[in-house]
Amino acid sequence: VKYFVTLFIIVISCNTFAQQQKTNEIWNGADAFSMDNLGNLYIIKESVVFKADTSGRILLTYSNNNQDRFTYVDAIDPLRIMLFADEFSIVSFLDNKLALQSVINLREQNFYDIKAVCNATDGFWCYDHSQQQLFKYNFTLQKIAETQPLALLLNNPLSITSMCANDKWVACLNNNSGILIFDRLGSYVRSFDAKHASCIMLLENMLVYAENNELIFIDLKLNLETSRLKTDINNINSIKWFHNCFYLLANNKIIQIAYKKD
């Protein structure tokens, strides 16, 4: 009984957000976006990358001369902005001035079926579907971590469409199945049943994912859902957080939502 009372108190005392929402559309026409920890947005529109502030004011642009269509951007490291062109499995890194630093052709590293990548503070992760594994490389292309073949760990079919990482966790969205959690070294931790999740984000020890028009919060240390936030926004494709605001990509628009903790 004491355990359940304690658990109930934990759930009740978890931080929640007020349902009153102040929304602001700051960008129209984005294919993908990311944010760094300084509040800069990095927005992809086909083969062009825009760096903008939180009001949507353009600060810098980068245009790809090779005509690779970027499909993903990750700014977890503000000094190494990661871009991914999935058609040719090419990863590019820009500095904070959007100057090109390096280009990595993953096919030249014998990866021919890369479905998802993400940045990390000491390298980058990629998911190769043909091998059904996650691999982590440093910036000199030395392999520093890998998972077991995921088919040995899971019963569900694998269709990983996106991933994200911080200095504690790696999260993968397994489409129409759930979310896979690994530690920073690639050891499998657990899965969450989230068949309708559309995107994921890591915030310290918190996993945040979108499901329909809600944001769901999971404490990864407690393995506990702490709260849900209902929004007026559907088709959420990406979630970012900066300075008491969520930034959501939905229907090619970036929408800023201010929240106040209760």
Model feature map: region roles:
Residues 1-23, 261:
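Bacterial Sec-dependent N-terminal signal peptides
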Residues 19-26, 57-63, 100-107, 143-155, ...:
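A short beta-strand motif characteristic of beta-propeller blades
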Residues 24-47:
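Beta-strand-rich domains and repeat architectures in extracellular enzymes and scaffolds
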Residues 28-36, 67-75, 111-120, 155-163, ...:
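Repeated scaffold domains used in trafficking and secretory/extracellular systems
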Residues 50-51, 90-92, 135, 179-181, ...:
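WD40 beta-propeller blade core
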Residues 53-57, 95-99, 138-141, 183-187, ...:
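Short loop/turn segments that connect beta-strands within beta-propeller blades
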